[in-house]
Amino acid sequence: MNRRRFIKGSMAMAAVCGSSGIASLFSQAAFAAESDIADGKIVRFDFAGLQSMAQALAKKPWGGAPGPLPDTLANLTPQAYNSIQYDAAHSLWNGVANRQLDIQFFHVGMGFRRRVRMFSVDTTTHLAREIHFRPELFKYNDAGVDTTQLEGQSDLGFAGFRVFKAPELARRDVVSFLGASYFRAVDDTYQYGLSARGLAIDTYTDGQEEFPDFTAFWFDTAKPGDTTFTVYALLDSASVTGAYKFVIHCEKSQVIMDVENHLYARKDIKQLGIAPMTSMFSCGNNERRVCDTIHPQIHDSDRLAMWRGNGEWICRPLNNPQKLQFNAYMDDNPKGFGLLQLDRDFSHYQDVMGWYNKRPSLWVEPRSKWGKGAVSLMEIPTTGETLDNVVCFWQPEKAIKAGDTLAFNYRLYWSAQPPVQSPLARVMATRTGMGGFPEGWAPGEHYPDKWARRFAIDFVGGDLKAAAPKGIEPVITLSSGEAKQIEILYVEPFDGYRIQFDWYPTSDSTAPVDMRMFLRCQGEAISETWLYQYFPPAPDKRRYVDDRIMR
């Protein structure tokens, strides 16, 4: 969306909300006390007006991709871009006494070409003023930026913003909105991990994926001493517009976001993703194919967890597949889902740079009836940790047509543990490896004659110990092949049970094998459901090779 189109949209919103008239001296004084950087014209603002603005915008053609930036910004290297720092003396709420939160902005440049507009809102009068770009808001350090190219470019805007929380004001941020509609938050470890997005469009279709942009933000000024604030956002893309309201709670051990969105479709949409999240899984206990490093595991998230509308809890360990995989788990009014990082043991990662053991989980809790649809999971092959290869979102069953209006309410929890968990036994870990031999016997002098793949799933909690004397029964369902050598082993170190079985192929097919298992005692389920997708090797690879023999 170009600047002229945005201004027209802003004028439409002003018409809906009412003209500001002559601002009172009190209103001007309030803005001055909150921030010395809001310098635009004073206009009225409220969420209803933003919804009207987004709806009106959807009836007009999309403004297109962002225009070019000045050369000195467009050609920045990642190192140069990262050296540009916002001047904390010009933070948004620098003038608020006893502030517990503050806002700083990201500079446009490098790949961040969308010029995002920022507004400060007086919560008492509902009046807003724009914050225009000017070079003196930033410290350019060794970035090599020619600031003379930036003089007078007040419409340059910003790339995004980040939130700081006391006592780490201006030092360590806890929330970040940067690029398209991406945003992230941390728990009490201050370690970023996976990302969320405002919306996903056509992630897995025969066409090009579309990435909507947050093109403007309005910040309600946080109250003195408060760790909660509200920010509103306008979303825009070729297919849809949206009005968003984020109420962000920056708590001691987690960040919680209450999200309300109103979406307006410009055109038919093949696949709409609600509450999308993006993560990375390179290797873990269950997948060691590309993990030839000193790090035993490399991942931002280790599983997809789902609390289905019928009350069933599901654990689906993530994979780094050999080819792209897309799975849709059908549901009706889901209770929650998320990408979790539950393994918090440093020794399982041995990474003093990435600190994967400290990365947060992200849980989505619908706050309204979402109806029928699917929790969709896409896993993309990756050979390293720098590419996000896992995408998850809710896909409504109903097709989206041009002119449709939709609304969703949900809560996001950025925390070490999800806010709820199954009262039944839970999956702690999934391991895979060579099969076809008795447990306790390791290949040495000879290898098994018949190829098989072993799966070991560790369960903890619930009523496992009470159920053991009565008999624990693993209920295993496979889309192909056979499960043999099934064992139930008590493991004292984690005070739980390991269910182990070997998968034997019954054909030469290399199609993914869908596996499903839960534990039962006297006809009643006593565990959450474990789902897995295994990719069998080609028939000529289904043999063991003695590594001691040089070939």
Curated annotation (Swiss-Prot):
- Biological processes per GO annotation: beta-glucan biosynthetic process
Q: Where does this protein chiefly localize?
A: periplasm
Tell me the keywords, alphabetical order. Periplasm, Signal
Task: Give the signal peptide range.
Answer: 1-32
Cell location:
Periplasm
GO cellular component, alphabetical, reads: outer membrane-bounded periplasmic space
PTM comment for this protein?
Predicted to be exported by the Tat system. The position of the signal peptide cleavage has not been experimentally proven.
Q: What is this protein called?
A: Glucans biosynthesis protein D
- Species annotation: Salmonella enteritidis PT4 (strain P125109)
Top-level taxonomy: Bacteria, Pseudomonadati, Pseudomonadota, Gammaproteobacteria, Enterobacterales
